[in-house]
Amino acid sequence: MARAKFERTKPHVNIGTIGHVDHGKTTLTAAITMSLAALGQAKARKYDDIDAAPEERERGITINTAHVEYETQDRHYAHVDCPGHADYVKNMITGAAQMDGAVLVVSAADGPMPQTREHILLAKQVGVPNIVVFMNKQDQVDDEELLELVELEVRELLNDYDFPGDDIPIVSGSALMALEALNGADSMKKGDNEWVDKIYKLMEEVDAYIPTPERDVDKPFLMAVEDVFSITGRGTVATGRIERGKVVVGETVELVGIRDTRSTTVTGVEMFQKTLDEGMAGDNVGLLLRGVQKEDIERGMVLAKPGSITPHTQFESEVYILKKDEGGRHTPFFPGYRPQFYVRTTDVTGTISAFTADDGSAAEMVMPGDRIKMTVELINPIAIEQGMRFAIREGGRTVGAGVVSKILK
């Protein structure tokens, strides 16, 4: 069968598999690609291909992540799977693989386990908006009542972390049985094999339940300032990469962060020495600003659609602290620790005032390799919003990564 040309006609969604070690995340990922490949909608990927995930660096942190892509009738998916638990934690906190939704894999034979809980909590903290559940290893459970019991447990657990546990689709099946059927068959269509059909059913639920995300260009405009120039006779130009939205010549934008928020008008948009009518998400541009002096702007400020983002100094965050062998600190740190927080394009000094463990208790100190919730107070207000990522640095070296889970003031 000739491989069809990849047309970007379908909406694109990023998803990932999450759940406890050995509950079958990678096997399921392989089963999804194999079953959709049988319909000509994916390239089949074997378990070993996915498990040998390449190393990536994101915000100074090394993470192993496997990326696969496939299509359903309605959508194109990019799917991320991590081999180790630590990779999941780092991946979700750094946002290396942004997820619009996740497939939570729970072994029907074991029920929810500690990492099941931890991944659900992480999904909540880092803003993964939707979860669909796959109850795996159904072939190992003869008792229908036991299946129902595990399903109830999973729904309760999701409710505990403010996901709509009663409404979330749960599909049971066996990724391994599906893979074996697919490996042994020359061709496969819906209705040929009950185990493969359960994988198709899962993808139908993912299609229906996980909404298509708003595209970056449709969000309110935001560009973090990287550099500032003064052009004689023309004015001040701020350069940077547009993070989201679009900006049109003549539009009013706000300059937010470090100092008082002020408005200015964009009188020109330039890219690669050419003038444009508008810049959009992903473009590296220079914006010519009316009535602003070069000294009024500095790196670390953002230009944004008026009213869309505000400056803050205090927030709660979910953080991963690097281990010594990852290039992190060698020693623990305590409340009162003052590192730099690298947000978008700049370092801002801040004080860490409190640590909270998963169970809500206060932690006395943080060790390299820990994941912890911490309260941070910055010395300068900067444009912050929930779900925003940052790195924690000490003398230019990354010692941790975090995501804003709640703005305090």
UniProtKB/Swiss-Prot annotation:
GO terms for molecular function: GTP binding; GTPase activity; translation elongation factor activity. Belongs to the TRAFAC class translation factor GTPase superfamily. Classic translation factor GTPase family. EF-Tu/EF-1A subfamily. Its EC number is 3.6.5.3. It comes from Acaryochloris marina (strain MBIC 11017). GTP binds at residues 19-26, 81-85, 136-139. SUPFAM superfamilies: EF-Tu/eEF-1alpha/eIF2-gamma C-terminal domain, P-loop containing nucleoside triphosphate hydrolases, Translation proteins. HAMAP family: EF_Tu_B (MF_00118_B). It is found in: Cytoplasm. GTP hydrolase that promotes the GTP-dependent binding of aminoacyl-tRNA to the A-site of ribosomes during protein biosynthesis. Residues 136-139 are annotated as: G4. It comes from the Bacteria. This is Elongation factor Tu. Residues 81-84 are annotated as: G3. Keywords: Cytoplasm, Elongation factor, GTP-binding, Hydrolase, Magnesium, Metal-binding, Nucleotide-binding, Protein biosynthesis. Residues 174-176 are annotated as: G5. It catalyses: GTP + H2O = GDP + phosphate + H(+). Mg(2+) binds at residue 26. Residues 10-214 form the tr-type G domain. Residues 19-26 are annotated as: G1. GO terms for cellular component: cytosol. PANTHER family: ELONGATION FACTOR TU, MITOCHONDRIAL, ELONGATION FACTOR TU-RELATED. InterPro entries: EF-Tu_GTP-bd, EF-Tu_GTPase, EFTu-like_2, EFTU_2, G_TR_CS, P-loop_NTPase, Small_GTP-bd, T_Tr_GTP-bd_dom. Residues 60-64 are annotated as: G2. Monomer.
